[in-house]
Amino acid sequence: MSKKNSVAIMTTISAFLFCAVIVAASLSPLAGTGAAANQFNSAGMWSAVGMILVLYFIPFLVYMLGVDAMRYVMAVLCGFGLLIHLSSAGFILMFSFFSDHLLSEVIFVLGVSLAAAAVNVIWFVAAFRSGAEKTSVNTLT
């Protein structure tokens, strides 16, 4: 599979999981943590999902049109996403330990957040692996 296809697949999965974190958090007790928290199916939740999709789609579209340097812009955004998902996972753990809510009430959000962080790490591997690491079927060494 080509590097561009790998990046496209991982970017799509990453965008889906980022949106899933927002939706899952709005369905969990985390939705009641403050005035800025999104309730499920609210305008705030949909605007957050829309903003994430726009922030994924624009650099992805430019990259797919052939601007290979956009991979570095996407890497910075992926790094921000990794930071967001890992800090969200830490916040969710702290929330469950120091509130009246059990870990079982937020475990799905925690799992999706950690899965999104793992996908972002895999995205870096897919985007920046070297061509020398690929094994060829035709070599007889």
Swiss-Prot record:
GO terms for cellular component: plasma membrane. Coiled coil: none annotated. The keyword RNA-binding does not apply. The keyword Transmembrane applies. Pfam families: DUF5391. Keywords: Cell membrane, Membrane, Transmembrane, Transmembrane helix. The chain crosses the membrane at residues 7-27, 47-67, 75-95, 106-126. It comes from the Bacteria. InterPro entries: Uncharacterised_YxaJ. It is found in: Cell membrane. Its main location: membrane. It is a multi-pass membrane protein. This is Uncharacterized protein YxaJ. It comes from Bacillus subtilis (strain 168).
